Amino acid sequence: MTQILHVSDTHLDKRQYGQDLRRTDFADAFDASVDIAIDEGVDAVIHTGDLFDDPTPSVPAVNRCLDTIGRLEDAGIPFLAIVGNHERKREEQWMDIIKRFGNAKRLSKSPTVVTDANGNDPVSVYGIDAIRSPEWDGYDFTLDEPESNDHVTILCMHELVQPLVPEHRGDPYDLSEDVLDRLNFLPTALALGDYHSTCNDTVDGVKVFYPGATERCKVSERGTPSVYLLNIKDGELSRKTRAISTAGRENVPRPFLTVNIDF
């Protein structure tokens, strides 16, 4: 059985409420997701965008990120990622630097194959970076064919799509018309980022899911920060949710206290 951990929206270097403590919290949450990957002994980690909170992260944040990804390399676990809208730059991306560190790779329209330790249960993983709105209508969604028809296929994207994302949340695209109908083949699954709530659905026979963010980015985000453990066996993909808190780190994620004040 091949196992892949799906992580998204880590927003490293986010100094929420102007607090350095929160910057550390986001880094700790990413570390916790790696704790889970190592604990589960997964065959790869996929990250579906917004690794960093903005295009110009601080040097300490980049170094902490590399240290965390280095833990995956020490465990022999590849780190496969796409670029989100928050960290996106005009030309070369942060993933182009990070991928120079051994086990990291920036996903593309060509498949990256992941298998279990014995070479069984192959998965072809694809990635499309966050697409700028003016480029959406003319974007070419053509993917290279997988090496074999027996591969499970996963496409990673960083977009808001209906029906998983409510219409009032950021003007989401229609998943069937705006994405799936424009692909040259339907993947087994669509692993998504950008939406910070954990949710899933099946659309046109494709399993579609958001793991949500690894830390709480807004006070209005009340879900449990989580990652997905994807299990692939005999051509079938199943999914299990693991809360970031199950890594066992103190105050990761940090609990919020909401106080309503009547005037």
Regions found by a protein language model. Name each.
Residues 6, 47, 202-203, 232:
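Generic beta-strand structural signal
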Residues 45, 190, 240-242:
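Generic beta-strand hydrophobic packing signal
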Residues 55-209, 213-231:
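His/Asp/Glu-rich metal-coordinating catalytic cores
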Residues 1-68:
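N-terminal active-site segment of His-dependent metallophosphoesterases
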